[in-house]
A protein has these predicted regions:
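Glycine-rich loop/hinge motif
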Residues: 1-26, 96-104
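Acidic helix-start/capping segments at beta-turn-to-alpha-helix junctions
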Residues: 10-14, 34-40
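DNA-binding alpha-helical recognition surfaces that contact promoter or target DNA
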Residues: 19, 34, 229
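Bacterial extracytoplasmic/cell-wall-associated proteins, especially those involved in peptidoglycan
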Residues: 26-27, 40-240
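Short, well-structured active-site flanking segments
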Residues: 26-36
Length: 240
């Protein structure tokens, strides 16, 4: 039996992962997506909210790592191996999640946004605090307004949904410029640093942040006025 080693990085979505498995001749992308999003009898699956609005029910529940697979294996075997690794990692943070006042799905959803929004792991606890502060004050900040969710709609939902009605439904559930609070589910598969950032965020009174895409520097703001100045500093807007 021939084996192959495949590395998955933090922030990949299930579509990326499925393609990578197919490219490495482990199993087909379609078989993987079907099998991975089904219940496999693992305890933690009972803690995943099935709110009916998640595009892929198990998006976010894949632990990014390097795995050894058999070439031409079944998607069922592959999924089982991946679930075992996720369950191991989940056990290490399960108590923290219970104490956080958030559900597992909320933690993983926010961690997936932090994974894609933060310029570096060091910034993750502060970036998490911005989103948590906004979630804590829904009257003032009803929406998270994260571009990462619109990218997920463009790259995953619009390419994989069956029909227009389905695209419209999921867009409403995932677009953080339209929906209140968190999207319906995770938008990528975050690593441990992002999960821990959500569970142990920095205490701040920031409600905005932006990244200078060239330098990777992050600017935080308490008010919209400060944020608008930061956008200029970060090279994302012209001075008014």
């Amino acid at each position: 039996y021939k084996t192959v080693s495949v590395t998955f990085t933090e922030g990949e979505n299930l579509l990326d992962i499925a393609k990578k498995l197919e490219d490495n001749e482990v199993c087909t992308a379609d078989d993987f997506l079907f099998e991975f999003n089904k219940n496999q009898g693992f305890d933690f699956e009972n803690d995943v909210d099935d709110n009916g609005d998640m595009f892929y029910r198990m998006e976010g529940y894949f632990y990014p790592d390097t795995y050894e697979f058999y070439v031409n294996d079944s998607a069922g075997n592959v999924t089982k191996k991946l679930r075992e690794q996720f369950e191991k990692k989940y056990e290490t943070v399960k108590a923290k999640i219970k104490n956080s006042g958030m559900s597992l799905n909320e933690v993983m959803t926010l961690a997936s946004i932090v994974q894609l929004e933060a310029a570096s792991e060091d910034e993750m606890p502060k970036v998490a605090s911005v989103f948590l502060n906004r979630l804590d004050d829904p009257d003032t900040y009803p929406m998270l307004q994260s571009d990462t969710t619109t990218n997920y709609i463009k790259n995953v939902i619009k390419t994989e949904a069956d029909n227009t009605a389905s695209i419209e439904h999921y867009t409403e559930c995932y677009d953080t410029y339209k929906c209140k609070g968190l999207p319906a589910g995770p938008i990528c598969n975050p690593g441990m640093a992002a999960i821990n950032a959500v569970l142990e965020p920095k205490k701040t009174d920031y409600y905005y942040f932006c990244n200078n895409l060239k330098t990777g520097e992050t600017f935080y703001a308490k008010t919209l006025d400060e944020h608008e100045e930061n956008l200029v500093k970060a090279g994302l807007a012209k001075k008014k």
